[in-house]
Amino acid sequence: GTGTEPAFGNTGTATDPGDGIFTNIGLQASPEFPGGIKNFLALVGKNFRLPEIGEKATMKVFVYFVVEKDGTLTNIKVVRDPGYGLGAEAIRVLKSIKTKWKPGIQNDKPVRTAYNLPITVEIKN
């Protein structure tokens, strides 16, 4: 690869999660935003600056990030960008949200967890 693709999969071991990044599948507890993912998406929507494209449109920006052991978000990347600056705006908004997530849990310990999130953007020009 070119080194830009997000790495999926588990690089820790079952007995010592270490700093490997886990996927949501098979985790004891998935990472969670306070109030749930709907709450997180509402916050994203409130802070998202929509482009002026002169027509109504619904687009999806697919983002990838890592929920760290302390609940912060890192490695924020756009996996699929519909254009119009929406990918860059998605990254800006995610970085601006300071509320911490509850981290993923494996073997009763917080672990770094990969998270994929589609953000639907509705432009009502």
Residue ranges of predicted features:
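Charge-biased low-complexity segments
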Residues: 1-125
